[in-house]
Amino acid sequence: KQIAFVSNRDGGKATKIYVMDTSGNNLRPLTNDAKLIWITSPNWSPDGKQIVFVSWVIGKGAKGNGKSSGIFIINRDGKNIREITKDSKLTSVESPSWSADGKQIVFAASAAVGKNGNEIYVIDINGKNLRQLTKDANDNHHPVWSPSGRQIIFSSRRTGNYEICVMDINGANIRNLTNHPAPDYQPSYFVPSLLSVSPVENFKLTNWAEIK
C-alpha cells in the first residue's frame, strides 16, 4: 500500500505529488515538471495504477495571466503525464474523482472567466467526450462517484445554502440529501479499500493525501 500526497517540502513555491509506503519509507517525488506550479487533489485510480490531480499550469492561461488550471493523469511510476482537459476552456477546475470502472473522471469547473458558479462535468480519461451534468449556475462543487458507478454526490448551493446532493450519472434526478442552515460540503463515500487523509494542522506541508 502507498500514500500519495501534495507538498512543497523541497522549499520551492510550487507543490509536487509525493508517494511513499504506508510505513513512511520509500518517499519519492512523482511530479517534477516546472510548468506545474500548484498541484492539488491527487486521487488514485480504482486499480491503483494511475493518479488524477489538478494543477495550475504556466502557459497561455484562460484568465489571460499566463496561468490556467487543468486535470492531469500520471502513472504511478511518474511516467506518461498528460492533461485531459487541455482542449476545453474551463476554469477553476477542482475535485476530480474516478468512476468505478476507471474510465471516466467527474470534476467541477467554471465554463468561463468571471462566470458565477461551478458546474459538474464528466470526461473520459483520454480527454474525449466532455459533457456537462449540471446547468444551473448554483455553485456546484466536490463531486464524488458512487462505488456502484450509478450516481454522483456533490455539494451545491441550489437552495441558497451548501447542501449535499445526489444525481444520476447523466445529470438527471438531482435531489438534496441534506437540508440544514449550516453549510454541508465535501462529501465522501466510504470505500473500505481506500482511506483519505487531510491533516489540516500541517497544511503548509501536506494538504491532501490518499492511501491506496
In which residue ranges do the predicted regions lie?
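Sequence signature of WD/YWTD-type beta-propeller architectures
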Residues: 1-212
